[in-house]
Amino acid sequence: MTISNTRDITPELIEAHGLKPDEYQRILELIGREPTFTELGIFSAMWNEHCSYKSSKKWLRTLPTSGPRVIQGPGENAGVVDIGDGDCVVFKMESHNHPSYIEPYQGAATGVGGILRDVFTMGARPVAAMNALRFGEPDHPKTRHLVSGVVSGVGGYGNAFGVPTVGGEVNFDKRYNGNILVNAFAAGLARHDGIFLSEAKGVGLPVVYLGAKTGRDGVGGATMASAEFDESIEEKRPTVQVGDPFTEKCLLEACLELMASGAVIAIQDMGAAGLTCSAVEMGAKGDLGIELILDHVPVREENMTAYEMMLSESQERMLMVLKPEKEAEAQAIFRKWGLDFAIVGKTTDDLRFRVIHQGEEVANLPIKDLGDEAPEYDRPWMEPGKHAPLPASNVPQVEDYSAALLKLIGSPDLSSRRWVYEQYDTLIQGNSLQVPGGDAGVIRVEGHETKALAFSSDVTPRYCEADPFEGGKQAVAECWRNITATGAEPLASTDNLNFGNPEKPEIMGQLVKAIEGIGEACRALDFPIVSGNVSLYNETNGQAILPTPTIAGVGLLPDWSQMAKIGGMQDGDTLVLLGGDGTHLGQSVYLRDLFDRADGPAPFVDLALEKRNGEFVRSAIRNGQVTACHDLSDGGLAIAVAEMAIKSGKGATLDAGDGLPHALLFGEDQARYVISATPEMAKLIALNAEGAGVPFRILGTVGGDRLKISKNVDVSVADLTQAYEGWFPNFMNGELTGNN
């Protein structure tokens, strides 16, 4: 039976593929004829935002991407950074937002699967995962179902695959009611001489399909991920892929074994737009053409058309260019792991992307125009408006600061995430030194006595909404600060830029200014961006998400015996605030959660201060002077010391300092840390801080079972712990809504 690959190309069909009339005109001019149905699908997949970055490319080029430790920057499946001794860390963050809203379990699971593949396709064994999740307001009827599905999906895939989840974020805001965010991060370890790239080399060489069979799942997924949602969202369920972590585990082992055999010339995982994107990227990067014969593609469904095979996003698949003499050896490895291995085409020297099905040519397109020379836009953008200054004296005070602290520490955004991370395997592989719940996750580097890596993921979307430039800076600074607070040296970062519709100048303005802020902070902090992902059109019925440029970073600890945790303080220790007192309440959680206001500017990020204070803290930790360390962020000083008290199970008696109590307690000024140390060490730290020009203040002493701050706060650590640990399980059990 012959499967029909033809359909009439109508304006409706073109629009359904997300192609604008001018883009279709460009296709006609490029190929000099009407495209086939398969070709239309290929253009639609390769020219959408998800694959081409057409709206953001111009601005992404401005980011700092190189540094003394950077081995591979953006443009590959993941970034590669040197960690010494011939080892490198390979990492990236990527979104799976749209699929996770439609089908939370599979959407999140395949997001984890996709990012793990990005790491091991480079030749690295995954050693750590994180996920940054944003949901709608807790009261929204869908939120609990989405949280439950996404967390189960992330855990179900990561746990079965066997990678520890070491960190992440979970936040709630009504602006995510119609579009949740699932940003998945993975990191792996490799040797310098064992890094594999996706650039095809050599003509007439076999192109090999590896892994699971191809089905109809996920057809059109990349196109869906580049569109806004509306009322027809339920119809999009078939565009969500289905993942199998056990197949992926076999694929990992088979790929690493194959790489060790010397058979691999180039390798690319099949992610968005499946076979189309992986083949085009490999060919275009190597300035080669690719010919595919679809009759050789392993399929698990009958009568699949060329269009379906080319655009399927079935999971756990790879494409590779192979050394011909190694074919038998390569095939034996994949058969051993129970995976498909099929030669589905060859490299050519004519820069054409040719697809053959049932003996007929169903696509013949210029490969460069699909790949690195795809359309690029310089979209109009508007400078975001600025908030007027908001002095702390203009912000109302609360009558009862103890009650305010209990309310904030037990709020949806600041309470413990234990309910989430207890569903993840945080200890598998046996190298975890710090699990979620602190400033950064830390794992030992296998094969080294003392070396460890620290990981954090951060962004404060409400700051980005108020001021995308400062918000972009702050996301980088907080990630850098969290890594620093363990004693690690931040090495490099990856960005996951989640925004609304870039065709709206105000949204495009948010993206442009956030990238500017990120770039400025990365340059100032020597924290280059080595990989990343952009997710646009996160809007439903015209309502955009908060601008959310998530930054994930990796840091290096030369000796993990000199490492700080947030829960390490001991009775009798002195607590020291480094970096100055709180003054800034604009865009604070104090204003938002106690007064339901989003007023004032985001806090200013002084990058020179950030660097100086951070380097001071890091050296104190590495010199063994510190028993605990925590950076200040949401909720300021009061929340930071409350978390330290909860994690160490100890109280403290502190002096809030001179000034307005709400600003001293809850101000969100940046570049600040609280450390604990023995009284003798605290004196030395104070002396050193004075010499280094780092503002400091002795806060008080650790001890007892209550947290007392001046005359304002007096609350038991038990009550703090109950509020902190209670919100999430109670919410998931249906016992409460938003803010109680």
From Swiss-Prot:
Binding site residues for substrate: 95-98, 117, 241, 313-315, 535
**Cell compartments where the protein resides:** Cytoplasm
Give the Pfam families listed for this entry.
Answer: AIRS (PF00586), AIRS_C (PF02769), FGAR-AT_linker (PF18072)
Specify the pathway.
Purine metabolism; IMP biosynthesis via de novo pathway; 5-amino-1-(5-phospho-D-ribosyl)imidazole from N(2)-formyl-N(1)-(5-phospho-D-ribosyl)glycinamide: step 1/2
Keywords per UniProt: ATP-binding, Cytoplasm, Ligase, Magnesium, Metal-binding, Nucleotide-binding, Purine biosynthesis
What positions does UniProt annotate as the active site of this protein? 50, 96
Enzyme class, top EC level, equals ligase
Q: Where does Mg(2+) 2 bind?
A: 118, 269
Q: Could you say which residues bind Mg(2+) 1 here?
A: 94, 533
Give the record's GO biological process terms.
'de novo' IMP biosynthetic process
Can you tell which superkingdom this protein's organism belongs to? Bacteria
Molecular function terms in GO for this entry? ATP binding; magnesium ion binding; phosphoribosylformylglycinamidine synthase activity
**EC number(s)?**
6.3.5.3
Query: So what does this one do?
Result: Part of the phosphoribosylformylglycinamidine synthase complex involved in the purines biosynthetic pathway. Catalyzes the ATP-dependent conversion of formylglycinamide ribonucleotide (FGAR) and glutamine to yield formylglycinamidine ribonucleotide (FGAM) and glutamate. The FGAM synthase complex is composed of three subunits. PurQ produces an ammonia molecule by converting glutamine to glutamate. PurL transfers the ammonia molecule to FGAR to form FGAM in an ATP-dependent manner.
What is its quaternary makeup? Answer: Monomer. Part of the FGAM synthase complex composed of 1 PurL, 1 PurQ and 2 PurS subunits.
Cited HAMAP family? PurL_2
Q: Which family does it belong to?
A: Belongs to the FGAMS family.
Report what the protein is called: Phosphoribosylformylglycinamidine synthase subunit PurL
The source organism is Brucella canis (strain ATCC 23365 / NCTC 10854 / RM-666)
